[in-house]
Regions:
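Bacterial N-terminal signal peptides
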Residues: 8-15
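Cleaved targeting-peptide boundary
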Residues: 21-29
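The canonical Cys-X-X-Cys-His
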Residues: 28-38, 100, 104
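Sec/Tat signal peptide C-region and signal peptidase I cleavage site
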Residues: 15-21
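Axial heme c-ligation environment in periplasmic c-type cytochrome domains
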Residues: 43-54, 58, 71-107
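Short microdomains enriched in Cys/His and/or Lys/Arg
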Residues: 19, 54-64
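Soluble non-cytosolic domains of exported or imported proteins
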Residues: 22, 63, 67, 91-95
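Positively charged n-region of N-terminal signal peptides that target proteins for export
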Residues: 1-4
């Protein structure tokens, strides 16, 4: 009985912490697609101006590590003293950021 209760609680916590796919897509569209594009290719005015990477390219995906993406989403990206991308650590939870990293990985060809 004790095992059943523990497993039930574990499943409940895991379910509560998960981020729905619709929420991830909404976060991408709201916070990322203006520069990175809806398809992750970066073919937008801002994306081309900032020279963002094409997330559909296997080489880009290979070079870009999860921890680097997580840090960029959380803390932003600077080029010298200029901000290329604002951080979203105050607006997104760690689970939402982790889900965005997975979403970006899914752009790979």
């Amino acid at each position: 009985m004790k095992k059943v209760i523990i497993m039930s609680l574990a499943l409940l916590v895991a379910g509560a912490a998960s981020v729905r796919a619709a929420d991830v897509k909404e976060n991408w569209e709201k916070s990322c697609s203006k520069c990175h594009g809806p398809d992750g290719k970066g073919k937008t005015k801002m994306g081309e101006k900032l020279r963002v990477k094409d997330y559909t390219e296997a080489k880009v995906q290979e070079e870009l590590k999860d921890d680097k993406m997580t840090k960029a989403i959380k803390d932003g990206v600077k080029d010298g003293d200029k901000t290329k991308m604002k951080g979203f650590g105050d607006a997104l939870s760690d689970d939402e950021i982790k889900a965005l990293v997975k979403f970006i990985r899914d752009f790979k060809k």
